[in-house]
């Protein structure tokens, strides 16, 4: 029997980006908040010290900062006819672990989804007709651009994003992204200093008639003090961002933007190494009354609260809803139910170029450093004669020249021996690449549920992922690969190779940690688990914050939109819910 603890106003599951933002906003509003974090305490000064953080073997290869599958594994299959099997190691995606979550080891790409993304079904239907959407399960998200844009602004200024605005209050700006939706003000910091490869990419894209612009980056281009008064340092371009924490205080993370302020507030409590097992509902199932969790000693405890906020990694949010019976489970056969619906991923391709006479210095890198074009992203180009909708941003980034992972060689090079050594020597300074980050649109048969066979160490069913790349997304990716082929020509490289996506999602090789959907927001409780404020339709004192709320995934990294949704939900709670608890949207 779990020991019942004194009641709190709010209990938050997880202290990554969303949990720290919700914690800061709700404590500022005067609420007593406790956050339960499954992983350990992690702090920049003591855990990410610059003296040992740049350890490629420990962090990039052995995945020291990531969730151990022994704590939470998942099963996967490509379609309903297959039997799902456990992923014994995380490969395709890498969830975070501990305070800061995946916000510790990310690169820093900080995009805004476009206005058309939030009304995607309406937008595409009006432009192309309903038949164009084929078997896609697209739906509008709920908020208008005017409603959600200020929340993007808050997250960008929290993080100190380095970039160049492309659309200021409807006026296209030179040097920025002409395809972005209108923003209220410029980025807080100017763009990063561009390395040779990205500069060369930008020049060639201009020659082809495209619109290159600097990647919006949560790596600091200059010293910065954010609105909470937290000081950040200028990026040193060390090349240790993705899979690493930043010991230089130069990459935005919960630790460098929010947590130092939050943990000093008297109405906030953080309990680490505490794993939430279940959200407990009232007998009628209409309200949450508490969460049950285990602490670091294995003791089972119950934390009552007036408000329960799930802020885990998106996949974990969905699993917690399923385990707690918050909302009806989605059924891909009937199409009914909402929890588990519209699981999406990211659809990518890439080009690798090798030269004889370059000197790229790839070790001068940063997580979010490069030039991008959005000419083939979203609906920036006409799809009328194409057999798909959606698109991809195409970027040339220079993230690292680390010795274990960065060994570019020409096609046909032996995998070992003297010729391999010579090829790696020649390729290191002479290789560059650019890649696409494509949209992932929902279909009926891609979804999340609980596995009927495999359980975790607490006896709870594992999350089961049923996913394969939809025909629409494969067609889109092949079209983008065709564009990449054309883009390689002006470089006159000695070798140029372009990858092409194949059906059959494989969970082993790393692809991207951009898992979205499963607990999606929307306007209709029959097709969405959450309303437009990320509040459960079925249990109104539960809010679920994260990429799990995305009704689809766009052709860009999700973190900027995750941060915006966190601020959007926090404002709804503080301005509306705490004044009049209950459903914020009536049906």
Task: Label the model's feature ranges.
Residues 10-12, 33, 542:
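Conserved hydrophobic helix-helix packing surfaces used for dimerization/oligomerization
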């Amino acid at each position: 029997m779990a020991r019942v603890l004194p009641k709190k106003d709010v209990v938050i599951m997880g202290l990554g980006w969303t949990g720290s933002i919700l914690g800061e906003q709700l404590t500022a509003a005067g609420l007593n908040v406790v956050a339960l974090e499954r992983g350990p305490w992690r702090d920049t000064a003591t855990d990410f010290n610059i003296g040992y953080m740049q350890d490629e073997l420990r962090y990039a290869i052995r995945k020291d900062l990531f969730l151990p599958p022994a704590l939470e594994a998942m099963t996967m299959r490509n379609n309903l006819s297959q039997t799902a099997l456990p992923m014994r190691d995380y490969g395709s995606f890498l969830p975070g672990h501990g305070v800061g979550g995946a916000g510790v080891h990310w690169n820093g790409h900080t995009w805004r989804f476009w206005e058309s993304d939030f009304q995607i079904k309406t937008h595409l239907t009006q432009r192309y007709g309903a038949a164009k959407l084929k078997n896609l399960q697209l739906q509008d998200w709920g908020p208008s651009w005017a409603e959600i844009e200020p929340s993007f602004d808050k997250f960008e200024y929290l993080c100190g994003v380095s970039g160049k605005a492309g659309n200021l209050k409807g006026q296209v700006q030179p040097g920025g992204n002409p395809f972005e939706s209108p923003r209220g003000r410029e980025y807080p910091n100017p763009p990063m200093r561009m390395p040779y490869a990205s500069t060369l990419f930008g020049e060639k894209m201009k020659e082809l008639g495209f619109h290159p612009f600097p990647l919006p980056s949560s790596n600091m281009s200059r010293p910065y003090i954010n609105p909470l008064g937290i000081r950040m340092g200028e990026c040193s371009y060390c090349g240790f961002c993705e899979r690493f924490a930043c010991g230089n205080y130069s990459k935005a993370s919960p630790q460098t933007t929010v947590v130092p302020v939050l943990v000093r507030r008297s109405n906030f409590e953080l309990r680490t190494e505490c794993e939430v097992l279940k959200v407990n509902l009232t007998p009628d199932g209409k309200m949450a009354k508490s969460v049950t969790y285990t602490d670091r000693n294995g003791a089972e405890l119950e934390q009552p609260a007036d408000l329960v906020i799930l802020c885990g990694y998106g996949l974990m949010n969905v699993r917690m809803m399923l385990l707690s019976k918050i909302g009806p489970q989605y059924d891909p056969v009937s199409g009914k139910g909402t929890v588990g619906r519209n699981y999406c991923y990211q659809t990518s391709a890439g080009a690798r170029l090798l030269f004889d006479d370059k000197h790229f210095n790839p070790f001068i890198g940063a997580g979010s450093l490069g030039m991008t074009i959005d000419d083939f992203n979203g609906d920036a180009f006409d799809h009328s004669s194409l057999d798909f909708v959606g698109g991809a941003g195409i970027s040339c980034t220079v993230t690292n020249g680390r010795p274990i992972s960065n060994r570019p060689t020409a096609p046909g090079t032996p995998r070992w021996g003297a010729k391999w050594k010579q090829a790696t020597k020649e390729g290191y300074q002479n290789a560059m690449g650019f890649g696409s980050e494509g949209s992932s649109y929902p279909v009926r048969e891609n979804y999340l549920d609980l596995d009927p066979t495999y359980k975790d160490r607490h006896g709870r069913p594992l999350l089961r992922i049923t996913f394969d790349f939809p025909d629409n997304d494969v067609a889109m990716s092949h079209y983008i690969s065709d564009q990449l082929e054309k883009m390689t020509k002006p470089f006159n490289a000695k070798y140029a190779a372009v990858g092409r996506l194949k059906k059959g999602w494989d969970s082993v090789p790393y692809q991207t940690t951009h898992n979205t959907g499963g607990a999606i927001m929307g306007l209709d409780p029959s097709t969405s688990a959450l309303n437009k404020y990320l509040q459960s339709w079925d249990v109104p004192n539960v809010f679920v914050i994260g990429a799990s709320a995305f009704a689809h995934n766009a052709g860009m990294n999700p973190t900027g939109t995750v941060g915006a949704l966190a601020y959007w939900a926090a404002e709804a709670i503080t301005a509306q819910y705490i004044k009049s608890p209950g459903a914020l949207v009536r049906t």
